[in-house]
Every structure is written in structure tokens, then in C-alpha cells.
């Protein structure tokens, strides 16, 4: 599976910078120069428009309206106006993508025939999805132009995503496997990552539909103590872990199957035993749900996670344990946890409350190193507007109805007309 690298907080796709230059003689349509690489008017405006579109999406998500006051303080940075944020974000995107392409070329990397075929297939699919079955690339070009997207840069973005992936994999491996294990573990320990397994004995129904009696809660409390005592009495680690797995399979109340009910639309969970027996009804409304609507969460081997991913009582207990030490019952809002702390595993997927996707610990560290590398090179980059352009040159494209993309050809014609 290919990894998509995020070059900026707001923008996932990346821009490729084209031809290099030398001296101070720039092409007529050059707007900006990044480390000696020229950025054309159309390239710059394309990404300015993308930044504006993202900002409109943010407003729409929070207010229900995509209308933006470009002179108002930005919700993404209160120290900038919305227009200033778009300019700054565009600059950062362009600079980082220039750095990525330069690093890619310096390492002598090339996109494979498979990569190029993937781009062609993506363009073909886009044409059919947006323009109808059998639509060719000219139809796609026309469609994109109608929604303020330049076809050439759209295609270049697809290429740059693959360039980013290839650069990342060359530096770190697909999932960070090129990093030294000791370095990954050091980062994890310094940043509070924990690997642990648990047996959960719930003292309340997880779906909120059954009220446990005092007697049932007392029974479950005693059960948690018995399980903990049994495991803590086993001195041999292998024997203890084998018994832990047996007790977890028999007693753990951690729900393994979850689904959004097609009836009441509430998320509910069921145990593996109920799933295997076809007992798929929602406890809230009784609707029978299909098996393929459930998502399976395999937690037999426990969890590797960052701070904030688990309830505080669980996390703090993990920190207090030595490796392979079993805790006494730990009370949380879910019930009682019998926890065993495990050694960190660089190849295990982690639960990170601040991450948008699941990655291994090694991949997480590699992703951070890649981002830090880009940030460092961005800070040192030489960036300047040229040919008399400055940020305010593009302010007229930001209108009450949104960003109005202007091509260099039209901009030049309009400027020549106004100069007469």
C-alpha cells in the first residue's frame, strides 16, 4: 500500500515545480523563484485558488456557508487575514513541493512505468466519473477548466504524489523499516507511547441498554480481582501470557464488532460470540443489521498507543508497570481493567488520537522525520516574487462569490488594456 505524504496541514496534494533557471533573467510569466526554480503565473494562481477553496470548505463545514470575508481574521490563523493565510499557505505548498522534487532528482530517482500507468488510469477514471462514460482527456480538461482547475497541474499533482511516495520510501522504507529500531524506540519512549493488553470486565452495559444490579456489579468486581490475582501469581512470563490470552478470550468484555444501525443510526457493539451466532440486532431499537455492516477490531494482542488514546486511568497505570507486569484491577468509566504492559513493537499499528490514519510506530517516526526535514529546508529556502509581482497583485481574484481564477493570458491582456 502506497503512503501519501502530507506536505502541509491544509493541503494533501502536492505541486511540482517545473523548469529551473539561472541568473536574473526570468520568463515573462514567472511570478516567484524558489531556490532558483521558476514558478509560473498559472502555477501560482492554481495553488492560490486551491488554498482559497480549502478555506471555503472550512467555512462551509462550520457555518454552513462557503462565503468568506477575505479581509477578516482567518479561523486557521488569527494573526492573518483570510487572504494572507491563502498567500502564506500557497507559498509553503510551493516551496515544500519544490524541495521534494529537488530531493527526488538529487537521489537519481525515477517514476516507474507502473507509476506512469497509474497516473493514466487515474486520469481516465476521473474523466469517466466527471464527464461520463467514454469521455476523453479533452473532455476532462474542459470540465476542470469550468471548476477553476488547470488540467496540466492536476496531472502534475498526481505525478508529485507518487514522487513524494517514492522519495519517502527511498529514505525510510514504505513503513519506516529503514530506520534503526533503537531510534524508533527512543522516540516512542520519549513521547509516551505504550504497548499493553488488557482484560476488561465491564460494570455497565456498553450500549447503555441494560442497567446492572448492585449484585451483578459486585460479582464482576470480584471476578476482576480473581483474574488479576491469578495472573499476578504466575512468575513465568510465557506461562503468564498464555494464561492471560485464555482468560481474555473467556472473560473480556471489550467489544470486537461495531456497526452503525440502519434503523436508529446509533453506533453499537457486540461480542464475537454473538456475531458468530448471527445475533446482529441493535440493542437500542431491535433492527437486524447485516453482517457486512460490522467492523471487526482485533485487539487480541492488545494496543500500542499514544497519550490521549485511552482513558487516563488506563494510560497512567500502563506507565507505572514494568514490562510483562500485571496490574491489579484498574477502575475506569468502562469497568475494571486487568492490564499487562508489553515491550514496544515498532511494526505494530498504533492508536494515535491526533493522527488521521493508522500507522506503525516506525512509520509514525519516519513521517515525523520527513516532515521535520521539509520544515527545516523550507525555513532555509530562498523565495522571492519577481517581475514586479507581490502578494497584493492577486487580491482582485478574491471576490465575494469566491476565488476567480485568471489565466496569465487573460491577466496580461487585461493589464495591457488598463495601461493604455
Spell out what each predicted region is.
Residues 1-7:
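Positively charged n-region of N-terminal signal peptides that target proteins for export
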Residues 16-20:
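C-terminal motif of bacterial Sec signal peptides marking the signal peptidase cleavage site
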Residues 23-27, 34, 138-222, 273, ...:
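PPIase-associated folding chaperone regions across multiple families
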Residues 29-34, 76-91, 101-110, 126, ...:
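Second-shell loop/turn segments in exported
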Residues 9-14:
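Hydrophobic helical h-region of N-terminal Sec-dependent signal peptides
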Residues 42, 46, 88-92, 97-105, ...:
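Solvent-exposed, polar/charged alpha-helical surfaces in well-ordered, non-transmembrane soluble domains
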Residues 23-149, 420:
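N-terminal targeting/tethering segments
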Residues 226-312, 343, 349:
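Peptidyl-prolyl cis-trans isomerase
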Amino acid at each position: 500500500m502506497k503512503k501519501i505524504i502530507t506536505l502541509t496541514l491544509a493541503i494533501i496534494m502536492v505541486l511540482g515545480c517545473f523548469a529551473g533557471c539561472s541568473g536574473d533573467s526570468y520568463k515573462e510569466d514567472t511570478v516567484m523563484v524558489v531556490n532558483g526554480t521558476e514558478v509560473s503565473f498559472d502555477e501560482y494562481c492554481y495553488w492560490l485558488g486551491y488554498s482559497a477553496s480549502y478555506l471555503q470548505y472550512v467555512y462551509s463545514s462550520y457555518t454552513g456557508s462557503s462565503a468568506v470575508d477575505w479581509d477578516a481574521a482567518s479561523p486557521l490563523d488569527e494573526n492573518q487575514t483570510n487572504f494572507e493565510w491563502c498567500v502564506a499557505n500557497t507559498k509553503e505548498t510551493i516551496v515544500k513541493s519544490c524541495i521534494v522534487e529537488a530531493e527526488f532528482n538529487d537521489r537519481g530517482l525515477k517514476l516507474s512505468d507502473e507509476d506512469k500507468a497509474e497516473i493514466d488510469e487515474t486520469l481516465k477514471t476521473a474523466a469517466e466519473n466527471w464527464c461520463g462514460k467514454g469521455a476523453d482527456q479533452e473532455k476532462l480538461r474542459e470540465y476542470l477548466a469550468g471548476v477553476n482547475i488547470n488540467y496540466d497541474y492536476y496531472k502534475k499533482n498526481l505525478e508529485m504524489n507518487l514522487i513524494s511516495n517514492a522519495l519517502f520510501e527511498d529514505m525510510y522504507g514504505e513503513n519506516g523499516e529503514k530506520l534503526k529500531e533503537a531510534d524508533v524506540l527512543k522516540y516512542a519512549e520519549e513521547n509516551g507511547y505504550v504497548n499493553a493488553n488488557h482484560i476488561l470486565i465491564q460494570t455497565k452495559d456498553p450500549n447503555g441498554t441494560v442497567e446492572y444490579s448492585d449484585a451483578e456489579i459486585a460479582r464482576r468486581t470480584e471476578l476482576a480481582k480473581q483474574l488479576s490475582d491469578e495472573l499476578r501469581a504466575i512468575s513465568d512470563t510465557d506461562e503468564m501470557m498464555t494464561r492471560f490470552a485464555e482468560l481474555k478470550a473467556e472473560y473480556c468484555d471489550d467489544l470486537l464488532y461495531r456497526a452503525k444501525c440502519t434503523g436508529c443510526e446509533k453506533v453499537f457493539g457486540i461480542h464475537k460470540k454473538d456475531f458468530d451466532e448471527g445475533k446482529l440486532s441493535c440493542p437500542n431499537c431491535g433492527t437486524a443489521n447485516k453482517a457486512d455492516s460490522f467492523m471487526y477490531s482485533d485487539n487480541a494482542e492488545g494496543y500500542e498507543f499514544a497519550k490521549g488514546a485511552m482513558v487516563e486511568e488506563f494510560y497512567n497505570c500502563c506507565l507505572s508497570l514494568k514490562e510483562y507486569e500485571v496490574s491489579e484491577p484498574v477502575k475506569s468509566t468502562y469497568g475494571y481493567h486487568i492490564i499487562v504492559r508489553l515491550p514496544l513493537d515498532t511494526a505494530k499499528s498504533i492508536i494515535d488520537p491526533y493522527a488521521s490514519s493508522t500507522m506503525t510506530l516506525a512509520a509514525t517516526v519516519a513521517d515525523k522525520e520527513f516532515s521535520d526535514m521539509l520544515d527545516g529546508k523550507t525555513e532555509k529556502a530562498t523565495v522571492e516574487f519577481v517581475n514586479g509581482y507581490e502578494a497584493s497583485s492577486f487580491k482582485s481574484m478574491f471576490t465575494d462569490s469566491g476565488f476567480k481564477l485568471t489565466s496569465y493570458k487573460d491577466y496580461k491582456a487585461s493589464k495591457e488594456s488598463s495601461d493604455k
